[in-house]
């Protein structure tokens, strides 16, 4: 069954396409938990076909369902809508900030 494969998304989404960003992040967080679409749906109280359609960018999604999915995945709702490219920038900036004091000898 294709929807239950635990494979990471193949390519980064267009940062301007929120449905693509949401689909990418949902799948990324779901696969990292080792969950199938069916398990995510069960944890959220939603139908598996709904989760599948959202991951395939077929449907718009209500904010309340984004909140349910985020809670089930153990992340803040905004993280599902944050382009992965932005997450990488934030992580890089955070790492740079932590390194600055040691590099300057303070």
From Swiss-Prot:
Domain HTH cro/C1-type: 26-80
Induction: Negatively autoregulated. Is most likely cotranscribed with glnD.
Superkingdom field: Bacteria
DNA-binding segment(s): 37-56
Main location: cytoplasm
Keywords in alphabetical order: Cytoplasm, DNA-binding, Repressor, Transcription, Transcription regulation
CDD domains: HTH_XRE
Ways its activity is controlled: Repressor activity is inhibited in the presence of the DNA mimic protein DMP19, which interacts with NHTF and prevents binding of NHTF to its DNA-binding sites.
Keyword Repressor annotated: yes
Annotated compartments: Cytoplasm
Biological process (GO), any one: regulation of DNA-templated transcription
SS bonds (residue pairs): none
GO molecular function, one term: DNA-binding transcription factor activity
Pfam family, one: HTH_3
Coiled coil: none
Task of the protein: Transcriptional regulator probably involved in the response to nitrogen levels. Down-regulates its own expression as well as the expression of the downstream gene, glnD, which encodes the [Protein-PII] uridylyltransferase, a key enzyme in the nitrogen regulation system. Acts by binding to a specific palindromic DNA sequence (5'-TGTNANTNACA-3') in its 5'-untranslated region.
Assembly and interaction partners: Homodimer. Can interact with the dimeric form of the DNA mimic protein DMP19 with 1:1 stoichiometry.
Protein name per Swiss-Prot or TrEMBL: Neisseria hypothetical transcription factor
Native source species: Neisseria meningitidis serogroup B (strain ATCC BAA-335 / MC58)
């Amino acid at each position: 069954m294709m929807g239950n494969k635990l494979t990471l998304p193949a390519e980064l989404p267009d940062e301007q396409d929120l449905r693509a960003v949401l689909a990418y992040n949902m799948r990324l967080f779901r696969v990292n938990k080792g969950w199938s679409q069916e398990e995510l749906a069960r944890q959220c109280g939603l139908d598996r076909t709904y989760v599948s359609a959202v991951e395939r960018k077929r449907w718009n999604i209500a904010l309340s369902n984004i909140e349910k999915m985020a809670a089930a995945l153990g992340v803040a709702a905004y993280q599902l809508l944050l382009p992965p490219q932005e997450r990488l920038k934030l992580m890089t900036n955070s790492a740079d900030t932590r390194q600055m004091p040691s590099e300057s000898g303070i």
